[in-house]
């Protein structure tokens, strides 16, 4: 997968290209991340990349000319078929379904805003989609872009060590993940659930699904409203709810 990034702070993306899962993906040639800095497309000695907004008001906007030239360079490098995304609080909120959709693209160009944002005409002429990571304001689009890259890269074949890992993540099936345990078997008097030590994979899978359903019901009940649960899942959820009521009543 190829991802181009337009950012005034390209060095921030070393966190993606040199570390962790995405860093290994870059090293093995599964993920290619290239950055363009609008400052490289300025022609004054101060490398100015901000400008005042028409109509006045606080703050500055990213200067149009350097930003557009950087986007054009990224498009030229990408060739045909690259989707251009602007990270913006006004965009579609990123969720697991959105990540899956974005992962079907072989090429993405992510535009990271700074200051008060970018000229609306640049959005109209250069941007295909706007995406947000949540209803809050950040200093720029770099962190949202890194979140998007990390989430999307997990669906690139070969990036994760186990092919099923991405499918079993929280939200992959619309549910929160089940609890996980590793050694020691007993920690501060708390034992690993016996079913996980049984070796019976059918029982283990049933327990995990019950915990996933129950955890979603407890923490994010609105997620269940949009799911068509199977008969088995309904039974498991009812079991969890009954067990939870018994524990809280003790």
From Swiss-Prot:
UniProt binding sites for S-adenosyl-L-methionine: 113, 133-138
EC class: transferase
A Pfam family matched in the record: tRNA_m1G_MT
Keywords: Cytoplasm, Methyltransferase, S-adenosyl-L-methionine, Transferase, tRNA processing
InterPro entries: Alpha/beta_knot_MTases, tRNA_m1G_MeTrfase_C_sf, tRNA_m1G_MeTrfase_TrmD, tRNA_m1G_MTases_N, tRNA_MeTrfase_TRMD/TRM10
EC number per UniProt: 2.1.1.228
Subcellular localization(s) per the UniProt record: Cytoplasm
Keyword Cytoplasm among record annotations: yes
Entry keyword annotation includes Repressor: no
Reaction catalyzed: guanosine(37) in tRNA + S-adenosyl-L-methionine = N(1)-methylguanosine(37) in tRNA + S-adenosyl-L-homocysteine + H(+)
GO cellular component term of the entry, any: cytosol
Subunit structure, as described in the record: Homodimer.
Family: Belongs to the RNA methyltransferase TrmD family.
Function, in words: Specifically methylates guanosine-37 in various tRNAs.
Xref: PANTHER family: TRNA (GUANINE-N(1)-)-METHYLTRANSFERASE (PTHR46417:SF1)
Protein name: tRNA (guanine-N(1)-)-methyltransferase
Organism per entry: Proteus mirabilis (strain HI4320)
């Amino acid at each position: 997968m190829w991802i181009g990034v337009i950012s005034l702070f390209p060095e921030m993306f070393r966190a993606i290209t040199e570390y962790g899962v995405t860093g290994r993906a870059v090293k093995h040639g599964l993920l290619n991340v290239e950055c363009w800095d609008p400052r490289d497309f300025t022609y004054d000695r101060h490398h100015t990349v901000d400008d005042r907004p028409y109509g006045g008001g606080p703050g500055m906007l990213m200067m149009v000319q350097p930003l557009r030239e950087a986007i054009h360079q990224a498009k030229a490098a990408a060739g045909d078929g690259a989707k251009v995304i602007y990270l913006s609080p006004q965009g579609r909120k990123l969720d697991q379904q959105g990540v899956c959709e974005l992962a079907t693209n072989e090429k993405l160009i992510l535009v990271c805003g700074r200051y008060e944002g970018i000229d609306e005409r640049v959005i109209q002429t250069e941007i295909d989609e706007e995406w947000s990571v949540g209803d809050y304001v950040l200093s720029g689009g770099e962190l949202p872009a890194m979140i998007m890259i990390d989430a999307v890269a997990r669906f690139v074949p070969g990036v994760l060590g186990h092919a099923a890992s991405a499918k079993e993540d929280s939200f992959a099936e619309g549910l929160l993940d089940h609890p996980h345990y590793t050694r020691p078997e007993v920690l501060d008097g708390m034992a690993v659930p016996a079913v996980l030590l049984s070796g019976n994979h059918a029982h283990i899978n049933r327990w995990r699904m019950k915990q996933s359903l129950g955890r979603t019901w407890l923490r994010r009940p609105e997620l269940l409203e949009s799911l068509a649960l199977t008969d088995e899942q309904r039974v498991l959820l009812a079991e969890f709810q009954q067990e939870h009521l018994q524990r809280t009543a003790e």
